[in-house]
Amino acid sequence: ALVSADGDSWFAR
């Protein structure tokens, strides 16, 4: 993930 501050829903999915 790129941004894991809101719930890791950026680049992990």
UniProtKB/Swiss-Prot annotation:
It comes from the Eukaryota. Nacreous layer of shell. This is Uncharacterized protein IMPP13. It comes from Nautilus macromphalus.
